[in-house]
């Protein structure tokens, strides 16, 4: 019944039965993750601590593959499932309060540091601009500001931020310390996208 309600929020007309099946299968896939991690009593694994937190009045979410989802999935959730997106924003803000940083690619209370950039910022800002405001806006702003202004040696999400702030770009080799696997351009583009938000 819950899946029918979730999938039924979008009604598709026209197309073939096969095309409608493809659409609803894709919609189903977009709703799998992030997923609720809090138990029925609200308990969840707190971010980066091994402690147990309690989500009061909201569902705590996990599996924030934000680099993969900040450009598309969260906009869908904001428009069609705003109550779910609001709980996801609350979860991200709570994570920043628990360990100091918004998540990039969080998995069951741990930051994996997988992928690039600072993708929680555009997700939160987009949700706010579309009218979702039932979260701690001041805490969200402080977390975003901390990420965008803290020097690299103390910045878990943007360790190569110093040249970006000083020069507007990140030189080759700053992050990787050599030319293998250098991500300087992608880091600068992702930081710029987050800062523009």
Question: Would you name each region that the model predicts?
Answer:
Residues 7-16, 60-62, 73-78, 110-111, ...:
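Second-shell loop/turn segments in exported
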Residues 17, 50-51, 63-66, 114-115, ...:
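Short helix-capping and inter-helix turn/linker motifs at the boundaries of alpha-helical repeat units
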Residues 13, 59-63, 73-75, 79-86, ...:
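A conserved hydrophobic secondary-structure block that centers on an alpha-helix together
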Residues 1-60, 94, 101-104, 133-153:
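Acidic/polar, glycine-enriched structural segments that form the non-catalytic walls/loops
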Residues 23-38, 62-85, 125-131, 195-196:
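Alpha-helical support elements that line or immediately flank enzyme active sites
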Residues 87, 91-197:
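Active-site cavity-forming subdomains of large catalytic enzyme subunits
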